[in-house]
């Protein structure tokens, strides 16, 4: 075997496990994002039902749901969106390439969502009107990020 092709073959065999590991790490990040969003949706469902007056307002339930939501929101960070995890690059991803094109704006939207979740935590157990106001702000914060950075279904 000639030296150059042998070297290329050796390099490719050595690099393949690293590439597979990177792909698995990206897959895990996407799974983690989906799990996190599912948990947030669960808590938002409780709060949204009360805000829309579809379920009776319960200060204790609202406070706990808002506390959980705020804790979950604090976990979201740009690090959960590594390069290579965009729609078309990774299976099951809904992350648009704009995340990596406008990283500062993306990080700012995450911070806005965290702030809105913290305000929800402070308001949810107070009364229905406070919950409803905080829900509008939280919905706007979530929507602004999803509108720009998430592929529509």
Swiss-Prot record:
Question: Which stretch is the leader sequence?
Answer: 1-20
Q: Name one GO cellular component term.
A: periplasmic space
Alphabetized, the UniProt keywords read: Electron transport, Heme, Iron, Metal-binding, Periplasm, Pyrrolidone carboxylic acid, Signal, Transport
GO biological process, any: electron transport chain
Q: Which domain of life is it from?
A: Bacteria
The family database entries (InterPro entries) matched by this protein are listed as: Cyt_c/b562, Cyt_c_II, Cyt_c_prime, Cyt_c_prime_subgr
Entry comment on modification after translation = Binds 1 heme c group covalently per subunit.
GO MF terms listed in the record are: electron transfer activity; heme binding; iron ion binding
- Which residues participate in heme c binding? 37, 142, 145-146
Q: Which SUPFAM superfamilies match?
A: Cytochromes
Q: List Pyrrolidone carboxylic acid occurrences by residue.
A: 21
Q: Where in the cell is it found?
A: Periplasm
- The protein's role, per its UniProt record: Monoheme c-type cytochrome, that is particularly expressed when cells generate energy via aerobic respiration.
* Name assigned to this protein: Cytochrome c-554
What is the organism lineage in this UniProt record? Bacteria, Pseudomonadati, Pseudomonadota, Alphaproteobacteria, Rhodobacterales
């Amino acid at each position: 075997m000639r030296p150059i092709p042998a070297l290329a073959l050796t390099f490719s065999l050595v690099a393949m496990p690293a590439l597979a590991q990177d792909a698995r790490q990206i897959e895990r990040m996407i799974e983690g994002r989906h799990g996190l969003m599912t948990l947030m949706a669960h808590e938002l469902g409780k709060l949204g039902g009360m805000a829309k007056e579809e379920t009776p307002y319960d200060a204790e339930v609202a406070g706990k749901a808002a506390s959980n939501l705020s804790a979950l929101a604090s976990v979201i960070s740009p690090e959960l969106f590594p390069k290579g995890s965009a729609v078309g690059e990774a299976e099951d991803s809904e992350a648009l390439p704009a995340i990596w094109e406008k990283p500062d704006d993306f990080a700012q939207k995450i911070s806005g969502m965290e702030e809105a979740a913290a305000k929800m935590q402070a308001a949810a157990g107070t009364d229905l009107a406070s919950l409803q106001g905080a829900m509008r702000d939280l919905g706007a914060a979530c929507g602004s990020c999803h509108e720009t950075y998430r592929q529509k279904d």
